[in-house]
């Protein structure tokens, strides 16, 4: 698989896991397996992964009431991966984002 990582999964629970236990949560492609996820994390962030836990999350069912009646639908299913890193390593999600904003402001002025 080319790149199984979609985006970091940032919630209160995942932030608490990161601060207390050094675990990071990511939304990944549904077809990704643990070895693909581990390889992608190590290549992208340059860290050593100790373990990977995955969970398949079902999409919520949605209903919309219209003049023509009830329209039922469903959000897409997705997969969540929780990564545990080796002791003393961390991932910075926001590296470089503030530098680009300052460069754009200085060019306009």
Swiss-Prot record:
Signal sequence interval, chain numbering: none
Annotated keywords: Ribonucleoprotein, Ribosomal protein, RNA-binding, rRNA-binding
Gene Ontology molecular-function annotations: rRNA binding; structural constituent of ribosome
GO annotations of cellular component type: ribonucleoprotein complex; ribosome
Listed SUPFAM superfamilies: Ribosomal proteins S24e, L23 and L15e
GO terms under biological process: translation
One Pfam family cited in the UniProt record for this chain: Ribosomal_L23
InterPro entries: Nucleotide-bd_a/b_plait_sf (IPR012677), Ribosomal_uL23-like (IPR013025), Ribosomal_uL23/eL15/eS24_sf (IPR012678)
Family membership noted in the UniProt record: Belongs to the universal ribosomal protein uL23 family.
Subunit organization: Part of the 50S ribosomal subunit. Contacts protein L29, and trigger factor when it is bound to the ribosome.
Function: One of the early assembly proteins it binds 23S rRNA. One of the proteins that surrounds the polypeptide exit tunnel on the outside of the ribosome. Forms the main docking site for trigger factor binding to the ribosome.
HAMAP family: Ribosomal_uL23_B
Stated name of the protein: Large ribosomal subunit protein uL23
Organism from which the protein derives: Chlorobium phaeobacteroides (strain BS1)
